[in-house]
């Protein structure tokens, strides 16, 4: 009886604050309402993503996975939050740290590990590897291996949506390191000029490879970097699944009416940049433990 009653509850959660540029913070969501089933769903999926990454780590270290491998453990709330706010009709395009996004867009764990192990049962028949998952049926346009190369393609997806009068947005994710890539700002300028329904989503995990944001960017307030293209910016806690969900829901409506938004999702990766990164020369273990 108690178990049945507990499943009926709903709760309102206060969301963490935002940092904004050229957009009124007062119009942003301040709370989220959730229930037992959604909480269970969130925890289940985030734990599955974490488990996929940890198992992949072990398989790589045992020599069964070869080539490149970029893990996203620590960033599970970001992938899950996006999936709660977007539909399969909203194209999502990302970069090489793509396992969590792929899983949330319908690529099964069986397909993920088949691909990582180079088997024909993999998502790309074992030919793409870690950085090139995709799922055309669910609007997941893949991971890309070169920093920033997915962004102009994402702008093209946004253009196609507007051209075809679709009521959807293109979600373009990239890391803090890509914020210093020229093609990002070329794509942003075009999206702003034509008022395309694009969300520029920065997965700021604080490090581009082994270089801290403060050592790589003159302006470390990444949510302000769309200003030159006249794109409003917002920073949110990317470790809070409901903060991500509610902001992206708001952003989708905003982009459909007014054009692109520039969003910095503050997150953190527990592993190094890739499996070749010993992760001991540029940050202390205490930093990871504190997070």
Kindly give the residue locations of the regions a language model identified.
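Flexible loop/turn segments at secondary-structure boundaries
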Residues: 100-102, 179-180, 207-210, 242-243, ...
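A short, conserved beta-to-alpha structural element at the edge of catalytic cores
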Residues: 194-214
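Cofactor-binding active-site loop characterized by glycine-rich and histidine/acidic residues
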Residues: 57, 62-194, 212-218, 223, ...
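Short acidic (Asp/Glu) and glycine-rich catalytic loops that position anionic groups and cofactors
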Residues: 21-23, 59-61, 89-94, 203-204, ...
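Glycine/aspartate-rich loop-and-adjacent alpha/beta segment that forms the canonical ThDP
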Residues: 11-25, 254-291
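Flexible, glycine/charged-enriched surface loops at secondary-structure junctions
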Residues: 55-57, 170, 258-262
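N-terminal amphipathic, basic-rich helices that act as targeting or association modules
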Residues: 2-5, 9-97, 105
């Amino acid at each position: 009886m108690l178990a049945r009653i507990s499943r009926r509850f709903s709760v309102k959660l206060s969301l963490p604050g935002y940092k904004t540029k050229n957009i009124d913070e007062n119009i942003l969501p301040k709370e989220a309402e959730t229930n037992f089933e959604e909480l269970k769903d969130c925890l289940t999926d985030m734990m599955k993503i974490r488990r996929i990454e940890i198992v992949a780590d072990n398989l790589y270290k045992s020599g069964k996975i070869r080539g490149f491998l970029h893990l996203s453990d620590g960033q599970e709330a970001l992938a899950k939050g996006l999936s709660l706010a977007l539909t399969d009709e909203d194209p999502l395009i990302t970069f090489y740290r793509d396992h969590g996004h792929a899983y949330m867009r319908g690529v099964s764990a069986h397909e993920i590990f088949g691909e990582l192990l180079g088997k024909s049962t993999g998502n790309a028949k074992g030919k793409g590897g870690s950085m090139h998952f995709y799922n055309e049926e669910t609007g997941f346009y893949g991971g890309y291996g070169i920093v920033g190369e997915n962004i102009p393609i994402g702008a093209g997806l946004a253009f196609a949506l507007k051209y075809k009068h679709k009521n959807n947005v293109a979600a373009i994710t990239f890391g803090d390191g890509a914020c210093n890539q020229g093609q990002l700002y070329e794509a942003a300028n075009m999206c702003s000029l034509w008022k395309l329904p694009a969300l520029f989503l920065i997965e700021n995990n604080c490090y581009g490879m082994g270089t801290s944001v403060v050592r790589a960017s003159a302006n470390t307030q990444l949510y302000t970097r769309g200003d030159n293209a006249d794109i409003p910016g917002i920073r949110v806690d990317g470790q809070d699944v409901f903060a991500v969900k509610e902001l992206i829901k708001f952003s989708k409506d905003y982009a459909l009416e007014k054009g692109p938004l520039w969003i910095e999702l503050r997150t953190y990766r527990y592993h190094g940049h890739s499996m070749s990164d010993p992760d001991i020369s540029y940050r202390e273990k205490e930093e990871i433990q504190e997070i």
